[in-house]
């Protein structure tokens, strides 16, 4: 097992490798940069170059006023061109271009994750996903049909967005009307009955007005999985007034409907590290893996969601150097699902005979009926000016936000046991019925922030930012009385069994101060070194709207707990080489997280935990030649618990669901005017799994390589085809595993996708 956990370059120590990288990258980058420069009379002249479609030069968020190459943070921008070339139809697929980021966690116990359940640098980042800089709530899968680019920022983002995950954030930028007319359409077919169509129409009306319409429809089965299906439709109309003038108004609407059959995973029997949970079930030690096509749900399982988002943004250029923006957004995400998952402990196994083919496991029904809403108004001012000889690049603003969540209580669903090796899904437990035992959460936030980049000299910059959030969270929860099991309560006198009884009604208010500071020095016109330090906080219940009374021992969201706090240090270098077509970056980072809530041996919670994530990351994005494009990166990260209860299955202090080594690279080459070829590979190293007392489950997932390829053919200016092949060598791997380790999701096998792209 130890060899499986080692990346091929393990013999290089992290710090030695990074130091050599930073020292070595400078002369190499300088030599490459010189190709785009000419020298006359000792005057440096940089030739103009065409920006790479694989390396957007600027964040679309006005809070990041500097180019990506001059931002003192690790930032990856995944462009629309990369998304199209790879056929990435959802956010999770797009994030495969960022090393160490992915949906590695499959849920706790019988509960399973849904949607974009993203982990980044040792932390759950699924509640730190933003659209146009505004929080997007909901455990749904986000389609890319209306996405211009995806921006991934590693390290604390509390100064940028308020409460957020301690190790990073993800910002999806929506498509907007532009000042040219055109139509792009695509039709795709592929493995597992994949069918998808998209339409993108932009039409100019007059001199300063344009409308845009994006439409998407998709139906598919999950490749390699029986019964698992996905179906979604989306429409995104928008209109812009005043394009090319000092006053611009954008009106946007997004509607997405999804009807999916969720996947609760399959048993880990037969995986490396698995052993039977008891002596009486020892036959499972040599009975072999289950068929990865097996579906352990029921024909009644479903995952339905509806997203509606309306946005109005007004921009006014006060002068050539100063712009004020005001954005108002209302959004609602409703999700309703019934998902079946197996329970793999020894007490859950029934053995009618000695033949394991007759054995069954208990099933549990995971249910959710939730509505998330957000209403926000945000004003931002950006300005560039001088005070004496010092230049300023300022971004400041205020935000008013109300977020609400209602979890509707539903009556429990009872399911029969399922055969371990030959599951039968022809079970119809019926749909969900509400019982009135709801949980309601609401958070109101007022925030004010200011960022400034100071140009001290031609080569030296300082930057800093501060954000103050004043928040107020209210939460109430009810339980249907007279039930059984964990969390059950008795019915008060005169109250009928099954009636909702309020068990929690509390509130929490407070202030959060987040800040960041950095410095950057240009070694040459094209390269720099930088340092950065950032502080980010998240209060109890900050990611799920759930609170518990002060002093209550059985909740991690007590109102008397302090906010979680993350401190990140980063030192790095960025180089624009080859006529500024290619961006090379390298960074060394450390994040310390404190005020972590830990569960004690008796099941109560205390706040004394500390975690640390440290390592280095290198990346590349852009054009090596005008015809050769590339995006990729490598990270080595060590995530450990410095103080608190060890949560890894093997008893170590390692944080689970965090690969120590991760690599990704995608490259595309325009061989002729009409033919393009692309190929990519990614590596996810071995990961520790969490622990909840499960016996015999794997402590690790094994590392794996996956390769993809693409062939493109241009028929004429109006039509081109592309063939994408995923998992080219049909690698068998564990994509995600749940906390107990009884269930996992197998990686997608080799699949094909043929797309016709039309342009008018």
PLM region descriptions:
Residues 41-180, 571:
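Acidic, small-polar-rich N-terminal luminal/periplasmic segments of exported/outer-membrane proteins
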Residues 240-242, 372, 391-393, 399-403, ...:
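Structural signature of Gram-negative outer-membrane beta-barrels, strongest in the C-terminal barrel
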Residues 683-692, 712-760:
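C-terminal beta-signal and adjacent terminal beta-strands/loops
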Residues 218-223, 235-317, 335-372, 413-445, ...:
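Acidic/polar loop-and-plug regions of large Gram-negative outer-membrane beta-barrel proteins
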Residues 146-148, 159-237, 243-248, 308, ...:
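Outer-membrane beta-barrel translocator/receptor signature
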Residues 587-592, 606-694, 729, 755-759:
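Gram-negative outer-membrane beta-barrel transporters
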Residues 310-332, 363-478:
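Face-selective signature of the C-terminal outer-membrane beta-barrel domain
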Residues 315-319, 323-329, 333-339, 530, ...:
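Membrane-embedded beta-barrel scaffold of Gram-negative outer-membrane proteins
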């Amino acid at each position: 097992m130890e060899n499986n956990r080692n990346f091929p370059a393990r013999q290089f120590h992290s710090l030695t490798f990074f130091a050599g990288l930073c020292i070595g990258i400078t002369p190499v980058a300088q030599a490459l940069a010189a190709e785009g420069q000419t020298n006359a009379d000792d005057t440096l002249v940089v030739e103009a170059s065409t920006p790479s479609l694989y390396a957007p030069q600027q964040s679309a968020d006005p809070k990041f006023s500097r180019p990506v190459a001059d931002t003192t943070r690790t930032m990856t921008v995944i462009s629309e061109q990369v998304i199209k070339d790879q056929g990435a139809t959802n956010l999770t697929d797009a994030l495969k271009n960022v090393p160490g980021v992915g949906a590695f966690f499959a849920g706790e116990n019988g509960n399973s994750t849904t949607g974009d359940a993203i982990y980044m640098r040792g932390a759950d980042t699924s509640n730190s996903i933003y659209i146009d800089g505004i929080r997007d709530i909901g455990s749904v899968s986000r389609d890319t049909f209306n996405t211009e680019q995806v921006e991934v920022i590693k390290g604390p983002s509390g100064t940028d967005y308020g409460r957020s995950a301690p190790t990073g954030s993800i910002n999806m930028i929506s498509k907007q009307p532009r000042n040219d007319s055109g139509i792009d359409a695509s039709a795709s077919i592929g493995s597992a009955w994949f069918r998808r169509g998209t339409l993108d129409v932009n039409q100019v009306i007059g001199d300063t007005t344009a409308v845009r319409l994006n439409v998407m429809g998709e139906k598919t089965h999950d490749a390699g999985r029986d019964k698992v299906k996905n179906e979604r439709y989306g429409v995104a109309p928008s209109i812009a007034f005043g394009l090319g003038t000092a006053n611009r108004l954008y009106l946007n609407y997004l509607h997405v409907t999804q009807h999916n059959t969720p996947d609760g995973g399959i048993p880990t029997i037969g995986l490396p590290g698995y052993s039977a949970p008891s002596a009486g079930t020892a036959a499972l030690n040599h009975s072999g893996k289950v068929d990865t096509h097996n579906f352990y749900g029921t024909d009644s399982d479903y995952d339905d969601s509806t997203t509606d988002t309306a946005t109005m943004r007004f921009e006014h250029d006060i002068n050539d150097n100063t712009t004020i923006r005001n954005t108002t957004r209302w959004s609602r995400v409703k999700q309703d699902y019934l998902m079946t998952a197996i329970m793999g402990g020894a007490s859950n196994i029934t053995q009618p005979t000695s033949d394991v083919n007759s054995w069954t496991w208990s099933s549990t029904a995971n249910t959710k009926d939730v509505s998330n809403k957000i209403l926000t108004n945000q004003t931002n001012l950006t300005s560039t000016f001088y005070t004496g000889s010092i230049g300023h690049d300022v971004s400041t603003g205020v935000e008013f936000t109300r977020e609400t969540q209602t979890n509707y209580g539903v009556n429990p669903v009872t399911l029969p046991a399922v055969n371990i090796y030959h599951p039968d899904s022809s079970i119809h437990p019926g749909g969900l019925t509400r019982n009135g035992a709801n949980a309601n959460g609401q958070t109101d936030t007022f925030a004010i922030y200011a960022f400034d980049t100071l140009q001290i000299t031609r080569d030296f910059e300082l930057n800093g930012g501060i954000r103050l959030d004043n928040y107020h969270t209210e939460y109430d929860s009810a339980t249907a009385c007279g039930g059984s099991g964990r969390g059950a309560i008795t019915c008060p006198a005169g109250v009928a069994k099954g009636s909702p009884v309020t068990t929690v009604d509390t509130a929490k208010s407070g202030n959060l101060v987040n800040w960041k500071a950095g410095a950057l020095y240009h070694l040459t016109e094209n390269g720099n070194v930088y340092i950065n330090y950032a502080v980010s906080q998240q209060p109890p219940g900050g990611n799920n709207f759930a609170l518990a009374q002060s002093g209550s021992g059985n909740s991690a969201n007590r109102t008397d707990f302090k906010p979680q706090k993350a401190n990140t240090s980063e030192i790095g270098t960025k180089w624009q080489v080859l006529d500024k077509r290619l961006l090379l970056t390298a960074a060394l980072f450390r994040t310390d997280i404190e005020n972590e809530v830990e569960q004690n041996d008796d099941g109560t919670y205390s706040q004394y935990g500390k975690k640390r994530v440290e390592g280095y990351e290198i990346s590349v994005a852009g054009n090596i030649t005008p015809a050769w494009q590339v995006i990729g990166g490598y990270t080595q990260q060590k995530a450990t618990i410095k103080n608190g209860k060890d949560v890894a299955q093997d008893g170590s202090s390692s944080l689970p669901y965090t690969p120590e080594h991760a690599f990704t690279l995608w490259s595309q080459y325009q061989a002729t005017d009409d033919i393009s070829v692309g190929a990519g590979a990614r590596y996810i190293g071995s990961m520790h799994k969490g622990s909840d007392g499960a016996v015999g489950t794997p402590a690790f997932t094994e590392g794996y390589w996956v390769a993809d390829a693409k062939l493109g053919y241009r028929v004429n200016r109006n039509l081109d085809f592309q063939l994408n092949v995923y998992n080219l060598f049909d690698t068998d791997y564990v994509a995600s595993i749940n906390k107990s380790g009884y269930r996992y999701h197998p990686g997608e096998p080799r699949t094909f996708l043929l797309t016709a792209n039309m342009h008018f």
